[in-house]
Amino acid sequence: MNATRVSQLKNQRQSLRAGRGRKHPRWQFLRGFIKHPVMVGSIIPSSKILIEKMLKPVDWQNTKLFVEYGPGVGTFTRPILEKMAPDAKLIAIDTNQDFIDYLADDIDDDRFIAVHGSAADVEAIIRDHGFDHADYILSGLPFSTLPPGVGDAIAAATGRAIRDGGAFLVYQFSPKVRDFIAPHFEKIDRGFEWINVPPATLFWAYRQRQH
């Protein structure tokens, strides 16, 4: 067997080992749900129809910083990157190190930043990356099942972190999230998407500060 053939076989074996080592995103999502059920909204990733409906109001041309809470395995992350401008940034924040490691390894995009941390610290996180405010923040975190005080802290920090005219995009399986976000946003639009498991309530909460 010549040296070229030996090298090809070696590369094939290495590729197969790498493939076996990489977890399928659905398995990774299920694993994250089992380890942190309070922090993951659903055992099944969001549908494509829900994703498009949730992101439809975004003004992508004027978006420089988009932040995502609880990205999981990137169900929303990838569509956001597809829609973003070349000079924009996406910061994904998750308390689950497994999800952050998976995304950092799986997504090769200079615009993407994966952060292991709490959404309650969003103001410090965006400052650490050179921004004063976010244009949009997206969340699928289950506010109604978060530990006491955490949901309120996240909602308040989010209200302060979003620029005037920006919005907090929230998809939930309980409408109670409105109680958390209403004190911090001047306008809230609401929708619903049946084609998702489970069906989800959607909120678009806008910052319209008085000058």
Can you say where each PLM-predicted feature lies in the sequence?
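Conserved SAM-binding motif I beta-strand of class I
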Residues: 89-94
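Core SAM-dependent methyltransferase catalytic element
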Residues: 193-211
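A short glycine-rich, Lys/Arg-flanked "PGG" loop and its adjoining helix->strand segment in the class I
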Residues: 152-164
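Conserved class I S-adenosyl-L-methionine
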Residues: 63-72
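Conserved SAM-binding loop of SAM-dependent methyltransferases across substrates and taxa
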Residues: 73-85
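Class I SAM-dependent methyltransferase Rossmann-like catalytic core
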Residues: 28-61
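S-adenosyl-L-methionine
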Residues: 100-128
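Conserved beta-strand signature within the Rossmann-like core of class I S-adenosyl-L-methionine
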Residues: 164-172
